[in-house]
């Protein structure tokens, strides 16, 4: 390659980087604005809750504070450090907790596209590297921060295993896991297999005080390469009996140390008003069903629910789901 052509390529690459930086800046600003809108609806965090990355009982305390005061904790998929910083800044400004989460693709982005992802090493390393950076910064922002990883389908269990190994190593050295929680999304598998795999991993996670999120039913739309946009409408709604099956399978292993991403018509992506038919009464009916079947007293909401595909939802819709 001639020096002239090499310089031309470098100049083009530099221009591309400038354009990318401009896009990143705009995206970060947009994320910060959206995060502020959601977070400002929350009750201010009391000083009794730990600031910085929270795990174990500290995380449960944050969840219970949200449950008792009737607000949701926003979760933002971060694919670059500038987006992560925007979330931290928004949480600080609103004095509210924030869930910072990484997808499999986000992990690869943090690691750099030049790395091979043999045995999921790059996806794991990218998530771990950004998690360590968040841990160093989060305590300075003065609010509880939840470190989480998003959808992990059956074909990505190697990624999940690598993340748990990193958690176990961190726990051995620091007495807590690196991440607060992780999500298993086996919603496309038979429910029996979904629950069996979740049980196996929850036993391992409970040993290091790491929280599990699981999915039952299918969230429509497309995210991180998983396309459910053609799913039949009836499959976008979980049944109370199915949610109760999850409760029966996981509650004996780690009481209240898991959450359920149930389907109530929610979809990934932003759609025109009227195109998404949310039925949050499914969540309320499931809570009542579990209370009745289990004979629970003194608790109106025994299950932690997750609202997937919340982008584009109105404040009224989020409030109704809560």
Please annotate each region the language model reported:
Residues 1-28:
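N-terminal chloroplast transit peptides
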Residues 310-313, 318-322:
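Active-site/pore-lining binding-face segments in mid-to-C-terminal subdomains
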């Amino acid at each position: 390659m001639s020096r002239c052509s090499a310089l031309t390529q470098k100049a083009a690459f530099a221009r591309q980087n400038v354009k990318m930086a401009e896009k990143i800046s705009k995206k970060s600003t947009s994320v910060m604005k959206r995060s502020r809108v959601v977070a400002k609806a929350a009750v201010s965090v009391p000083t009794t809750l730990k600031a910085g990355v929270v795990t174990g009982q500290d995380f449960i305390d944050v969840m219970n504070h949200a449950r008792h005061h009737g607000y949701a904790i926003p979760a933002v998929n971060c694919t670059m450090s500038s987006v992560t910083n925007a979330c931290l800044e928004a949480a600080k400004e609103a004095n509210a907790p924030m869930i910072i989460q990484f997808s499999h693709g986000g992990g690869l982005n943090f690691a750099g596209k030049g790395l091979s992802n043999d045995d999921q090493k790059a996806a794991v390393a990218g998530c771990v590297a950004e998690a360590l950076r968040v841990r160093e910064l989060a305590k300075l922002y003065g609010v509880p921060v939840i470190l989480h990883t998003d959808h992990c389908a059956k074909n990505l269990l190697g990624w999940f295993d690598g993340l748990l190994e990193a958690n176990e190593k961190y726990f051995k050295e620091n007495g807590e896991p690196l991440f607060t929680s992780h999500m298993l999304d086996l919603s496309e598998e038979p429910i029996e297999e979904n629950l069996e795999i979740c049980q196996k991993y929850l036993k391992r996670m409970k040993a290091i005080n790491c929280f599990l999120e699981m999915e039952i039913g299918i969230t429509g739309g497309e995210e991180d390469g998983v396309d459910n946009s053609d799913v039949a409408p009836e499959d976008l709604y979980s049944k109370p009996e199915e949610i109760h099956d999850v409760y029966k399978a996981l509650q004996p292993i780690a009481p209240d140390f898991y959450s359920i991403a149930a389907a109530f018509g929610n979809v990934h992506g932003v759609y025109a008003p009227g195109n998404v038919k949310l039925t949050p009464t499914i969540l309320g009916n499931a809570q009542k069903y579990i209370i009745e079947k289990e004979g629970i007293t003194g608790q109106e909401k025994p299950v932690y629910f997750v609202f997937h595909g919340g982008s584009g939802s109105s404040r009224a819709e989020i409030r109704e789901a809560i």
